[in-house]
Swiss-Prot record:
Compartment(s) where it occurs, according to its Swiss-Prot or TrEMBL record: Cell membrane
Gene3D superfamilies the UniProt entry points to: 1.10.3730.20
Superkingdom of source: Bacteria
Keywords, comma-separated and alphabetical: Cell membrane, Membrane, Transmembrane, Transmembrane helix, Transport
Protein name, entry field: Uncharacterized membrane protein YvaE
Electron transport as UniProt keyword: no
Family: Belongs to the drug/metabolite transporter (DMT) superfamily. Small multidrug resistance (SMR) (TC 2.A.7.1) family.
Listed Pfam families: Multi_Drug_Res
Gene Ontology terms, MF aspect: transmembrane transporter activity
Bilayer topology term: Multi-pass membrane protein
GO cellular component: plasma membrane
Length: 119
């Protein structure tokens, strides 16, 4: 369930960012209210996520995947330019998120002494 909460946090964060763009600097009421709702929801689900996923992993996945998704949304819906360098950078973000997930699974299976040293 913890990864479901993290996915919801990411989706709410992306919806909040889209609402921010549509609010035109808080000059449009409905997008401004949606911005507050979606960012509040994102932080709510991120907080639930942190009960069972390390903050370093959860925050990296949340921010990294948020960047990836909002870049795609910007390209598809706001006609934002996507350069080759941006695509390479997004690929590196995805590789980092995958690496963090793999490391977390390895770390869970390796017990640690209270001193912080591996057995």
């Amino acid at each position: 369930m913890n990864w479901v909460f993290l996915c919801l946090a990411i989706l709410f964060e992306v919806a909040g960012t889209v609402s921010m763009k549509l609010s035109s600097g808080f000059t449009k009421l409905i997008p401004s209210l949606l911005l507050i709702f979606f960012y509040g929801g994102s932080l709510f689900f991120l907080t639930l996520t942190l009960k069972s996923i390390d903050v370093s992993v959860a925050y990296a996945v949340w921010s990294g995947m948020g960047i990836v998704l909002i870049t795609v949304v910007g390209f598809l819906f706001f006609q934002e330019h996507v350069s080759v360098m941006k695509v390479i950078s997004i690929g590196l973000i995805i590789a980092g998120v995958v690496s963090l997930n793999l490391i977390e699974h390895v770390a869970v299976s390796e017990p640690v002494h209270k001193s912080g040293q591996y057995k």
